Amino acid sequence: MKIIPCPSSPLLARRVAEAAGIEIGGAVFKKFPDGELYVRVMEKEGVVVGSINSNEDLIALIFALDVLENAKAVVPYMGYARQDKVFQEGEAVSIKIVAEMLESRADEVVTVNIHSSDAASHFSKLKNLDAMPLVGEYFAGKDVVMISPDKGSMERVKTAAKHAGCEWDYMEKRRIDATTVEITPKTIDVEGRDVVIVDDIISTGGTVAEAARILYGLGAKSVSAACVHAVLAENAAIKLFNAGIKDIIATDTVECAFSRISVAELIAENI
């Protein structure tokens, strides 16, 4: 099988090919004047690599998979995974539909840190890889404390901190009275410390920006942000820097200026 890079993951696809010792296959992706996509794949079988960070990314990935007689799908960032259940009557469960689209065309689907176990449950042929150890290794030897912006991401931060060899904590909401809620790290004093806020996805950046302001208010020396998937929608990077974030560190599941960590070898070992 050859690697077929989608337009959303050209660099990562080539890194995966190099790490796995697999050739790049021939494919053409272009757009017609009316905005419709044209996809041609000059292979009968292949591993299609493409993150879903937009509707166009999804269509390009599905079209490429549909051409192949024997296909694997590598979706480093699985978009639509946050709508993993019906929250209000009448809602489409987006990830369920995406799972059906992918698994009807691919023998296996490989992704990295899908947003939740509920999202993963909609797949029957999913291999969900964990890049948090790689995030942790990036900070190995640095005197930092890792903080989860909420209790829900606690296990992710725990994993990253283990591989960084550093302390970790999570932000805890504590109700003071009927109208006041205090948000602080549960146990660690961050005064004078270099703090790294760790999460799986940074999308609009609102949660991380608010956490940064709180941490600076508690005397943190510096606050950086680290994540697997740097979606960074709606000028999120500007929002984070305005909140005092010193640096943003991410993997290349979503290719951007902050992609310092590559998941290529992790993927290559699992295809």
Swiss-Prot record:
CDD domains, A to Z: PRTases_typeI
Residues that hold ATP according to the record: 34-36, 82-83
Top-level enzyme category: transferase
Cofactor note: Binds 2 Mg(2+) ions per subunit.
Subcellular location, record wording: Cytoplasm
Binding site for Mg(2+) 2: 150
Domain of life: Archaea
Enzyme Commission number(s) of this protein: 2.7.6.1
GO terms (BP aspect): 5-phosphoribose 1-diphosphate biosynthetic process; purine nucleotide biosynthetic process
InterPro entries from the UniProt entry: Pribosyltran_N, PRibTrfase_dom, PRTase-like, Rib-P_diPkinase, Rib-P_diPkinase_arc
NCBIfam families for this protein: PRK00934.1, ribP_PPkin
Protein name: Ribose-phosphate pyrophosphokinase 2
Organism taxonomic ancestry: Archaea, Methanobacteriati, Methanobacteriota, Archaeoglobi, Archaeoglobales
Protein's gene: prs2
